Amino acid sequence: MRAVWVLGIDTSCDDTGVGLVRDGKVVVNLVASQVRLHEAFGGVVPELASREHLKALPLLVERALAEAGLRPKDLDLVAATRGPGLIGALLVGYTFAKGMAFALDRPFYAVHHLEGHIAAAWPEGLPPPFLALVASGGHTHLYEVLDLGRYRLLGATRDDAAGEAFDKVARLLGLGFPGGPEVERLAEEAEEAIPFPVPLRGQEGYDFSFSGLKTKALHLVEKGLPKAALAKGFQEAAIAHLAEVVLKAAKDTGHRVLLVAGGVAANRALQERFKEAGLEVHFPPRGLSQDNGAMIALAAWRRHQRGFPPSPLSLGATAYWPLEEA
């Protein structure tokens, strides 16, 4: 049987992602990072992100096809992130992908960004139901995955996303952007941690909150306390918070399988904490934690294999799109 090739594109925020998947296996995963561009501003500037996507995307698609030894007409499916995300950035990749699908007369799949993250951590052959934690710079959501395309939101952040909190604390500490890897690196230098309170202990639900940790970090920075110990304390509290909420949900639902996806999933201390939790835990392969196009191609391939119909080309991109409605 002839192989099925899927092109996936993600421009939901500040990374231009292009991936190629062959029969559910990632063959090419290219990401054009805008970190240096936005670093001076301490965060993503939406208009600049959109302009950079316009520059990078055509070249990245051309390079991906060349690396796989493919011509555009060899593609079987084209997919792109429809949302959620920065609408200007989303439109660049989404419109480009729809144009390719139309020109090549190929099926087009509009993919939810968070379903892409879940697909990246979802091993082939793992049956649902299970829990999925998506923790990144823009999202911190805990889902019960009932099946492909069937998700139940258990809890979400009440304020900052986990990755956003890492970025903001990194800025307070005078570190680079994105802040997650920088805080992790600095925390590893500390022998002792300055204690931080773990948020929402004793709550009945499964929500998250990171704004209090950020405020605590600000007060400690103003006191001139050691930065490495501060970073370690913040990271330990943030990870403990994520773990406690997830473990409570696992106990209440009876699920023993957990997927951890999104950029924060690359944090080594977080990985160790969840591995010690007594659950069967799955993380994305190296390179698939951050935003990328390969995860979008994976999600589209799985939908295609399961008989989900392609998306109409008339369907527009959207900044707000609950995963439960995808």
UniProtKB/Swiss-Prot annotation:
Highest taxon of source: Bacteria
Enzyme Commission designation: 2.3.1.234
Cofactor: Fe(2+)
Pfam families, A to Z: TsaD (PF00814)
Listed InterPro entries: ATPase_NBD, Gcp-like_dom, KAE1/TsaD, Peptidase_M22_CS, TsaD
Top-level enzyme category: transferase
UniProt entry tagged with the keyword Kinase: no
Binding, Fe cation: 113, 117, 291
A GO CC annotation given for this chain: cytoplasm
GO biological process, one term: tRNA threonylcarbamoyladenosine modification
Statement: the UniProt record of this protein carries the keyword Acyltransferase: yes
Recorded family membership: Belongs to the KAE1 / TsaD family.
Protein name: tRNA N6-adenosine threonylcarbamoyltransferase
Gene that encodes it: tsaD
